Amino acid sequence: YERMRAVESPRPFLKTFGCVNMKKILVADIDGTLLNSKKEISPVTREAILGILKEGHRVILASGRPLPGMRRFERELLLDLMGGYLVASNGAKVVDCTTGEVVYQQLLPLSVVPKIHAYAKNRGCGLITFMGDYSISAFPPDKYVTYEAKINGIQIQVHEDWPEFVNFDINKCIVTAEPELAEIYEKELQRLLRDEANVFRSDPFFIEVVPKGVDKALTLERLLPLIGAEH
């Protein structure tokens, strides 16, 4: 594999890394790119990607979604059988589809957990993180927490002892609120966590809290040498 500048693939949902007569690494975002308006991979798109895999190229799915929200598409595209990588949570976690190995990840410091919880409780926000195939909610789920679980195809567990329960590795948390309030809360959380995490809105009602420095493009830069691509 040789890494060249990113160029548009003939298949518009992909970026390609490589050159003529070399194996390529193709990177596809999920929402708004790989999926259609029904949040599905169309048959045409699926066949195109399977064709790419059969030619011996590698496919990487990159998304802001948590890892469990990407698993369905991994299976649909046979990446677990034919090889590929998932770049989840805006680049905070990378998994080898064939082995299930976590090849790279960045973690939130657990010191943010009680701070986010206290803030969300005070403001009446929703608050979740992820463990395995579950959304771990600090409070009874609001409509946005429910929506997030639905689009990712995962179940919700409510833990009233959330600050104590969340003592495992986490790649991101999501705070939910009405859009007009989320705009205000985003700025407040940025100030609260400025030394510990990056805070941004991925949707008008979703405020994401991720490790400092997390970026999908930077994660891809780190991943390519690990999978045999040359700079």
Regions found by a protein language model. Give the residues of each.
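Active-site phosphate-binding/coordination module
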Residues: P43-Y144
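Residue-level recognition of oxygen-bearing side chains
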Residues: E40, V44, D215
